[in-house]
Regions:
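N-terminal low-complexity segments that are often proline-rich with Ser/Thr-Pro
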Residues: 1-15
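Metal-dependent phosphoesterases centered on the DNase I-like endonuclease/exonuclease/phosphatase
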Residues: 16-101, 105
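Short, solvent-exposed helix-loop connector elements
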Residues: 90-91, 119-125
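Hydrophobic alpha-helical positions that pack around
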Residues: 109
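Short helix-loop capping/hinge motifs at secondary-structure junctions, enriched
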Residues: 114-117
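Surface polyanion/phosphate-binding segment centered on an Asp-His-Pro turn
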Residues: 122-141
Length: 141
């Protein structure tokens, strides 16, 4: 498992990490999880059009996630829930969590070879205590 947290140099960091992940994948399947601080597509945030130029939803950040997927990693939540609009982060401002104005910026990506083992991918948005909520996957071997 490789955990990441990406910030301003998202694209460059993700490219270097992607090279590492692809080399690691030559030896064993890979699970990548963490706070990517970026929503991938419109379904991954409550107000996509209002946020198109904002950090966390720039073209470069979205392309970074697309590159990860194109390299053969599966977005586990979106794979199992293609149309579900759930979020893993809400701003502390303006009652965002109460009004469910959130973003899905926390991810589990897995190697394609693990797809057959993926049983569940969940966002536990009922769990309070942070601006993020827990996410989980279940793999059965």
């Amino acid at each position: 498992m490789f955990q990441t947290q990406c910030h301003a140099q998202f694209q460059q960091q993700l490219f270097v990490q992607l090279l590492f992940l692809k080399s690691l994948e030559q030896q064993k399947p890979v699970v990548v999880c963490g706070d990517f601080n970026a929503a991938h597509t419109e379904i991954d945030l409550a107000r996509p059009h209002q946020n198109e130029q904002n950090a966390g939803y720039t073209v470069e950040e979205r392309q970074g996630i697309t590159n990860l997927i194109n390299a053969g990693f599966i977005d586990t939540f979106r794979f199992l829930h293609p149309d579900e609009q759930k979020y893993s982060w809400w701003s502390y401002r303006g009652g965002a969590r109460i009004n469910n104005i959130g973003w899905r910026i926390d991810y589990f990506f897995i190697s394609e070879s693990l797809q057959k083992n993926l049983v569940s991918a969940e966002i536990h948005d009922d769990v309070q205590g942070s601006d993020h909520c827990p996410i989980s996957i279940r793999l059965e071997f």
